[in-house]
Swiss-Prot record:
PANTHER family, per database record: SAUR-LIKE AUXIN-RESPONSIVE PROTEIN FAMILY-RELATED (PTHR31929)
Keyword set includes Oxidoreductase: no
GO process annotations (BP): auxin-activated signaling pathway
Family, as annotated: Belongs to the ARG7 family.
Pfam families reported for this sequence: Auxin_inducible
Protein name: Auxin-induced protein X15
Alphabetic keyword roster: Auxin signaling pathway
InterPro entries (alphabetical): SAUR_fam (IPR003676)
Induction or repression: By auxin.
Record keyword Chaperone present: no
Amino acid sequence: MGFRLPGIRKASNAVDAPKGYLAVYVGEKMKRFVIPVSYMNQPSFQDLLTQAEEEFGYDHPMGGLTIPCSEEVFQRITCCLN
């Protein structure tokens, strides 16, 4: 049994994200998620961005936006944004 997060698109091996989406890397394994750009305006997601800024500044090791939280926390937060 699984659950579906319609706002999160399945990450592919492609470097580019579709128009209106942004690739982020999450968790210890740096799993790639492709999320709607509209999430950037949500207060709960902005909290994650603040954490990312505090931990990484503007130097993100994966070349894209790295979110310093577990995959479970990220999915729980983004699930509420859908």
